[in-house]
């Protein structure tokens, strides 16, 4: 059984957004970078930076603040 990278990325972003957090960190892969580039261009993400920790690369995404979103209060 393989991993569904696209679903994992979207789910991570959705979970962080629903919990009203500002940033999410995902593993940096070629596919993840391409997906994030599209989300950035479409306005779902405000900023992206690459972070390296213990020889592993991550993408740190700053989510765009949305009004009237449902989810738990801070």
Curated annotation (Swiss-Prot):
Quaternary structure note: Part of the 30S ribosomal subunit.
Major place of residence: plastid
GO BP of this protein: translation
Keyword Lyase among UniProt keywords: no
Record-given protein name: Small ribosomal subunit protein uS8c
Its job: One of the primary rRNA binding proteins, it binds directly to 16S rRNA central domain where it helps coordinate assembly of the platform of the 30S subunit.
Keyword flag Flavoprotein: no
Keywords: Chloroplast, Plastid, Ribonucleoprotein, Ribosomal protein, RNA-binding, rRNA-binding
Domain of life, per lineage: Eukaryota
Entry-linked SUPFAM superfamilies: Ribosomal protein S8
Pfam families in alphabetical order: Ribosomal_S8
GO cellular component labels: chloroplast; ribonucleoprotein complex; ribosome
GO-annotated molecular function: rRNA binding; structural constituent of ribosome
The organism of origin for this protein: Oenothera ammophila
InterPro entries in the record: Ribosomal_uS8, Ribosomal_uS8_sf
Family according to the record: Belongs to the universal ribosomal protein uS8 family.
Cell location: Plastid, Chloroplast
């Amino acid at each position: 059984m393989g991993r569904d990278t696209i679903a994992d990325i979207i789910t991570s972003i959705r979970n962080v957004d629903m919990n009203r957090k500002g940033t999410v960190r995902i593993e940096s892969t070629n596919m993840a970078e391409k997906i994030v580039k599209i989300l950035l261009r479409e306005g779902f993400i405000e900023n992206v930076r690459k972070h390296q920790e213990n020889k592993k690369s991550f993408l740190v995404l700053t989510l765009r603040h949305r009004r009237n979103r449902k989810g738990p209060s801070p």
